[in-house]
């Protein structure tokens, strides 16, 4: 007997329109139900000229399941944190698998159009 494919949660949080990560501002410039494209610009002067666009990130829409974590140490030991199901913004380990970086908008749009 084969394994059942896990289905995506029926309700989940969407990707944010803007997101700050590692001193960069990410702005969603286009998306479908399958793929999104974000413009990456400098937000922290330690990374260069604030506002300068440095790259475009294209990635498949991946939905992470809801989960809970229990604080194991410190003053809040035993506290439970609940995280809802949500569309996942890629981490470093996801690039080359379901996320890609491009230095021009045209190249990013080409990948976006191939995936949508």
Q: Which residue ranges define each predicted feature?
A:
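A short, exposed loop/beta-hairpin motif centered on an aromatic-Gly-Thr core
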Residues: 90-110
């Amino acid at each position: 007997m084969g394994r059942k494919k896990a289905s995506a949660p029926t309700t989940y949080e969407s990707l944010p329109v803007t997101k700050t990560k590692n001193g960069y501002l990410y702005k969603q410039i286009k998306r479908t139900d399958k793929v999104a494209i974000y413009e990456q610009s400098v937000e922290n002067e330690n990374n260069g000229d604030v506002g300068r666009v440095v790259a475009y990130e294209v990635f498949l829409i991946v939905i992470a399941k809801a989960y809970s974590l229990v604080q194991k140490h410190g003053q809040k030991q035993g506290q439970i944190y609940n995280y809802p199901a949500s569309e996942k913004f890629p981490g470093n380990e996801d690039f080359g698998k379901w996320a890609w970086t491009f230095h021009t908008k045209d190249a990013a749009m080409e990948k976006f159009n191939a995936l949508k």
